[in-house]
Structures are given as structure tokens and as C-alpha cells.
Amino acid sequence: MLLCLAALQAPAQQLPGSIQPQIFQYPVTAPDVDPGIDHGNSDANLPEEFKKQMVFYRSLEPPGTIIIDTQERHLYLIQDSTHALRYGIGVGRDGFTWQGLLRVTKKAEWPDWRPPPEMIDRQPYLPRFMAGGPGNPLGARAMYLGNTVYRIHGTNAPETIGQAVSSGCFRLVNDDVMDLYARVPVGTKVIVRQD
């Protein structure tokens, strides 16, 4: 159907539940991310756990890999074997969660939105097309995953970060998705986990 999921590697080594991620004071801002432009939202009103930050994170994946933990509502961009840049995300609601291994196949700035037919069937009030811009639910940037309808994208509803509300996509506040977009090329490995 959607994916052959057998290609997933063993999960990263887990730390005991009582150990909290250690926050490091490394620079976490990507260069040249539209300085001086208001993108409609930032992480200013997010709970601390969903704000972008460098954390201690053990992984055998190479730097540049994206690991999405749908249970924690975090996206990790691997920096080295013990550090990752962590972003808060919104994830798929019940019935719209998935796991697997894909790659970023396309990137778009201020993407247009065309809800797929299945979404229109469920929500007939949706527009058939919406041009990119601040009112668009895909937000400031989108990274398309494989040949699926799923994306990592921004949002015009920052209050949904940390929530299970989407149709399977992963959303970040616009400032964060622009930062991530500047850091990852087409071809980036994306691992989606539900454990």
C-alpha cells in the first residue's frame, strides 16, 4: 500500500526514562533564513519542551538524518552520535499515524496546497486549491516525503504543535520549518517511529 516498512533499522539506544535530555548551548540558528521577514509565527509561545534546542541524543544514524518520534511529538536532526537538534512537531491524529523510512524527494518555499481526493471526501468544505502564503495550512516551507502525500511542513496554527491533529503530515512552527529546510537537502533520510 503506502510503504514497505521492513527497511527500518533498530531503534536508537534508549536512555532510562528518568534521564532528561541535556541541553547544550550550541548555535541552533541556520544561516540565511529570510532575516527580517515575519513568517507568521515562531516558537515564542510554545511550551519549553517543543522549542527548538540542541539535546543529548544517541543515534547510530549519520549526521543529517531526520528521526521523527510521533509519541514524543519531536523531530530530531542528527548532528553526531550523541547530539541532535530537536524541534517540536504536530503529528497525525488517530487513524492517520504511520511509521517507516523515506527520503525528502522535493522541497518548496511557500508551497501551494491541493488536498488529496481522500481528504476532500472526508472534509468536503476544504478548498480544492490554496496558493502558498501566510494563510496556507502548509506554512512557509514543505519537504515532501518519498512519493507519498506526506510532508514535513510549516503551519499557520502554531497552537497545534505537540498535538495529534494532522492527516499524517508533520508540522512545525514556520520559523522552525524554515530553519530545518535550510539544513536538509533533497535526499535526506527520514525515519518515522511510533514506539
Give each language-model segment a name.
Residues 1-195:
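N-terminal pre-domains immediately preceding structured catalytic cores
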